[in-house]
Amino acid sequence: CKAIRVENGHATVVPELCVLCGRCVTHCPAHAKHVRDDLTKTKQLFNLGKKVFASLAPSFASEFSDYTTEELCAALKLLGFYAVSETAIGADIVSCEMAKQLEEATTKNQDSLKSKLFLSSACPATVEYIRHQLPEFSEYITDCASPLLAHARYIKETFGKDCSVVFIGPCIAKKREADIFP
């Protein structure tokens, strides 16, 4: 990882180079790097009496394979979530938007490279990698929201802007994405 530097025997992460891939967490021999824990923030949202929705990553099925979807959703509601919805709904929204953008681009600019190259914005770590390591390709990143952001917007449009959305999934990069686009 190009963002990890060793200075005076200690590894540090250079924020300007970090693409949020999580390699520093998995490769640190001293186990000094950790994924940020947002349990306190989530509990604060519950305590404020807000409607808090869980946006559940599709990977939940492999992480909680001993439980049915219904059991997991019921457990999350017992913890205080108002409702549970799969982030995959956001992926459907993004797929439709991508198809529309692709059709528009190919109709307007059939001979241009822009009509032939589309880089998905679905993965915030990939987007950061392109912006930091391959900036010449940044213009080809679609302006679609990521599935997480599309899902959060859908929930807020459906249930009101005053509700909160908490992403539950394994992706470190989505934590920063949620910070940038609350």
Predicted feature descriptions by range:
Residues 36-182:
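Iron-sulfur-associated redox domains of electron-transfer enzymes in respiratory
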